[in-house]
Amino acid sequence: DKAAFAFGTPSESSYSNLKNLVSNQGVVASDSTGVGTGRSELMSANYGGDKGVFAYGTNGSGRTSVKNLMSNTGVIASDVSGVGTVRSSGNGAQYGGDKGIIAYGSTGSDVSISNLINNVGVIATDTSGVGTARRGLGAVAYGYSA
């Protein structure tokens, strides 16, 4: 029943690992320095029913496949080498109650790749050819009842 914003580009030449937690009343907390390599244009999704993952994106060296798991208390873990095609600017969502999916993005060219995330945050290998290749899209979960 809470949320988090993390990472991003606060200026044109820098990448941050800042995070802002959001309470179950919708109040956004002030900046706190996060963990992991600062990057932008990353993908994120929920998994495990109450946890999240931040993955892929762009840092000062280019696109990356790094992932950071977030606990159900809002703690973001250290960088873990990712799996799948290095890309940025895709998106992700929760599905099936306790799993996630991240998809699409850009490797320099738009791609139609998806990666499933199991209920413990493991990102599966690429599945290709999933709809029209694109980047900069939105994603949401639907069909859940409160």
Stretches with model-predicted labels:
Residues 1-146:
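Polar, enzyme-active/binding microenvironments
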